[in-house]
């Protein structure tokens, strides 16, 4: 969503409680500026980093659109204890959707978290949005993949399963050695 706050404009996503109250606002951190993507012309990058929200079922992070292309985004949510990362995005059919699917699958597996990417559909201002929203298991397997039509996806996830993968099945995060990284 487009958000104006303190004289600045953001690409943002609201975190709503089951009662419909706003419990937080996640803002895009990395703003794309390249041919056909002039987002810095109208968006300000967030200085708040990546937010993770507690729920009765588990912890949920939000990574907005372009942020997902930088692996630190989803990794940060995982290190903050996210069991699920939600990625609202707006990819067009001209973009490499198969590559984007693999990108999400690999990051879900590397971070042992569920990832749900929700993409736009339809046509606006000459752009055809791809849809193909998907939900990925901590193993990297696709649980559900939508087509290019508007639809509502209802999928039950056991978020405790992400913790099981992180702690027992593939404890990759525990193997990290940040002192050896740049």
Segments and roles (model prediction):
Residues 69-152:
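CN hydrolase (nitrilase-like) catalytic-core segments centered on the catalytic cysteine
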Residues 162-182:
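A conserved C-terminal secondary-structure "cap"
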């Amino acid at each position: 969503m487009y958000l104006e706050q303190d004289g600045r404009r953001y690409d943002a996503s609201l975190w709503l409680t089951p009662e419909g109250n706003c419990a937080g606002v996640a803002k895009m951190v990395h703003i794309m500026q390249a041919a056909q993507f002039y987002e810095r012309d109208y968006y300000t990058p967030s200085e708040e980093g990546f937010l993770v929200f507690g729920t009765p079922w588990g912890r949920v992070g939000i990574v907005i659109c372009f942020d997902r292309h930088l692996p630190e985004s989803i990794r940060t949510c995982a290190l903050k204890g996210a069991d699920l990362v939600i990625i609202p995005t707006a990819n067009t059919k001209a973009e490499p959707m198969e590559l984007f699917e693999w990108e999400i699958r690999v990051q879900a597996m590397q971070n042992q978290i569920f990832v749900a990417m929700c993409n736009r559909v339809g046509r606006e201002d000459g752009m055809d949005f791809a849809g193909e929203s998907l939900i990925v298991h901590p193993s990297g397997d696709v649980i559900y993949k939508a087509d290019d039509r508007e639809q509502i996806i209802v999928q039950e996830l056991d978020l405790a399963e992400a913790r099981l993968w992180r702690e027992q099945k593939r404890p990759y995060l525990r193997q990290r050695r940040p002192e050896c990284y740049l």
